[in-house]
Amino acid sequence: MILDSTYSLEEQKQIINDLVGKPYSFIESIKLKGIGSKRMVIEDISSNIKQYINTVEDINYANIELRSAGVIIHINKGLQTFLWIIPFYHLVIYKTNGLSIHAQGRFIHFKNNVTFKENKTFFEKLLNEKIKHDLKYDFYT
């Protein structure tokens, strides 16, 4: 689900909390050593999300916020901010030349550059949280 979060509304907060959980508290975020990525350069994006990025030949940025039951990808377009809300059960991550996140019939590919490499520990943390979440629903062990 993609929401325009330029102006925060109470209904949007409720939808986000229902899909990916409430935000981590200050103490929890310190224990996790951060819950957000640094901004990364978007290299490629699926055609059904292209309307949410800058149309001119400009660099597009996004960052990822970790929640207890999923992630939120913040996409910046000028002065607007769009949120792509992805529960863990929809999230698929591919490590190619850069990183590609797929969910809900959409994808976003981040460029393999310095800012991407600075986020290596964040992606390890993200994968660990996804594995922990998936183990809750592993009924065959």
Predicted regions and their residues:
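Acidic, Ser/Thr- and proline-rich intrinsically disordered linker/docking segments
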Residues: 1-44, 90-141
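Alpha-helical context
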Residues: 40-43, 47-51, 67-70, 77, ...
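Generic preference for well-ordered secondary structure
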Residues: 3, 48-50, 55-57, 75, ...
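Phosphoinositide-binding peripheral membrane targeting modules
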Residues: 55-94
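Short, contiguous, helix-prone interaction/anchoring segments in small proteins
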Residues: 33-61
